[in-house]
Amino acid sequence: MAEDEGYPAEVIEIIGRTGTTGDVTQVKVRILEGRDKGRVIRRNVRGPVRVGDILILRETEREAREIKSRR
């Protein structure tokens, strides 16, 4: 796949909701192609998402911060 098209990644785990209104879902994805093939990273996703979905990531360098529990 060409670099300008993105990198496919499979959702392997849904971690939780984040964002001020809970409209963002934090997920763990496994990169399927490219330089980081096989790497598992944490990303934030907007919109509906399920385990097994394939996302196209523009880049695989950045990783979302872990969701902290509120006290």
From Swiss-Prot:
On the tree of life, the source organism's domain of life is: Archaea
Report the InterPro entries cross-referenced here: NA-bd_OB-fold, Ribosomal_eS28, Ribosomal_eS28_CS
Recorded hits in PROSITE patterns, A to Z, give: RIBOSOMAL_S28E
According to the UniProt entry, its GO molecular function terms are: structural constituent of ribosome
Claim: Ribosomal protein is one of the keywords in the record? yes
Similarity remark: Belongs to the eukaryotic ribosomal protein eS28 family.
Name listed for the protein in its UniProt record: Small ribosomal subunit protein eS28
**Organism listed in the record:** Pyrococcus abyssi (strain GE5 / Orsay)
Give the gene name: rps28e
